[in-house]
């Protein structure tokens, strides 16, 4: 029996309960693999944001914070582990919903759910460990003072997340924010909110204190903008486009509000001629750009090939690309599903046509797979004869499209790799480990992969440089995003300070 092609009907999740949006509006949810409407989500607006922020502020300060913000980290850890357990219990259902909502292969969505559960478990451990790090002493040069550090939650945080890994990207923010003791308003992308709303259902099941996590779905200008500019939101964490990130920075600057931004990328993958196994390098190249249909901020979308191996490498890359199963994402073995929406589909096609008009060669792909007449599907696409002035070299496509240039020397490869406004990630494949270490230091990126592309571990920091944003998610750095550091210094001497001449005694 085929799985159901519908989604649960949910409201906004505010104050631990479901609420219909104040204006009563809802947005259709379209399965991008079939173009069928499979349900709808609530369309929140500024009025709903106001209610959610009030719920979060109340949850932060309720009873002096003893139930959440000032509770022991071990208390919060119990809730995070309970969420992780429910994610595992509902893994198959959540993966299916995410596939229906986003068009990604079911295998990929299933793996994402494993990562979601692991992320909540990891930050549960860090929440517990935080208890032991409070009042860390500071060594001072004066014996009559003692000083220590407190780490405290920032407060109410707005979390605005993208559509490419809907629940996972939300979890990268929700889990550390809750571990820190913050209360939160999550605003997922309107293009893929279904699994995030199910997180609200899970929080109800486990008894998360009301208002600790609130979920507002809706359009960016109507819900995201009021959230990022709200005077009672203490921080905004955003993952998405560079242009939206700029607007959030401008809004936050009016209140000197901290933000962390994980934005776009145009990451390079450099392959040298000393590799022993071309197919091994080709597969990593494929994974770096065709996984999740290339809708990955860190996708290694610029391939730099040493001129001595370029032809042989491209021949194998085309052969491997032809072998990818592009299909309905629910089919077993699917490795390339649809892109997220009609708008994204048309945007990617425009990038490809512009590359062709500017003189590039579409070596493989570039259009709709002939066997798929419906849905927003694109072939894996390889573009050669690219110059650095072309749009396809400079701008983020966010689709299954890779552009290729050749190089002769290591210094030329590094120069080409750094020829971008972005700085999220970079990769190098070579058997010369000293060369790999040199290039790791030379690339202007926050993440470097050696002999691979795209591995991601919750224990390691994630974030970029330049127009790819600032701040780091994941690992202990992800927790620090949601903590403030407070210095406490005590004067311990029985003697007076003695700076001023005392008045005469009566």
UniProtKB/Swiss-Prot annotation:
CDD domains: ALDH_F10_BADH. The record marks 164 as: Transition state stabilizer. GO terms for molecular function: 3-aminopropanal dehydrogenase (NAD+) activity; 4-trimethylammoniobutyraldehyde dehydrogenase activity; aminobutyraldehyde dehydrogenase (NAD+) activity; betaine-aldehyde dehydrogenase (NAD+) activity; gamma-guanidinobutyraldehyde dehydrogenase (NAD+) activity; protein homodimerization activity; sodium ion binding. Na(+) binds at residues 101, 191. Gene3D superfamilies: Aldehyde Dehydrogenase, Chain A, domain 1, Aldehyde Dehydrogenase, Chain A, domain 2. GO terms for cellular component: peroxisome. Its EC number is 1.2.1.-, 1.2.1.47, 1.2.1.19, 1.2.1.54. NAD(+) binds at residues 161-163, 187-190, 241-244, 262, 396, 462. The keyword DNA damage does not apply. One of its GO terms (biological process) is cellular detoxification of aldehyde. It comes from the Eukaryota. PROSITE patterns: ALDEHYDE_DEHYDR_CYS, ALDEHYDE_DEHYDR_GLU. Pathway: Amine and polyamine biosynthesis; betaine biosynthesis via choline pathway; betaine from betaine aldehyde: step 1/1. Keywords: Metal-binding, NAD, Oxidoreductase, Sodium. It catalyses: 4-aminobutanal + NAD(+) + H2O = 4-aminobutanoate + NADH + 2 H(+); 3-aminopropanal + NAD(+) + H2O = beta-alanine + NADH + 2 H(+); 4-(trimethylamino)butanal + NAD(+) + H2O = 4-(trimethylamino)butanoate + NADH + 2 H(+); 4-guanidinobutanal + NAD(+) + H2O = 4-guanidinobutanoate + NADH + 2 H(+). InterPro entries: Ald_DH/histidinol_DH, Ald_DH_C, Ald_DH_CS_CYS, Ald_DH_CS_GLU, Ald_DH_N, Aldehyde_DH_dom. It holds the Pfam family Aldedh. The active site is at 262 (proton acceptor), 297 (nucleophile). It is an enzyme of class 1 (oxidoreductase). Dehydrogenase that catalyzes the oxidation of several aminoaldehydes. Metabolizes and detoxifies aldehyde products of polyamine degradation to non-toxic amino acids. Catalyzes the oxidation of 4-aminobutanal and 3-aminopropanal to 4-aminobutanoate and beta-alanine, respectively. Catalyzes the oxidation of 4-(trimethylamino)butanal and 4-guanidinobutanal to 4-trimethylammoniobutanoate and 4-guanidinobutanoate, respectively. Belongs to the aldehyde dehydrogenase family. This is Aminoaldehyde dehydrogenase 2. It comes from Zea mays.
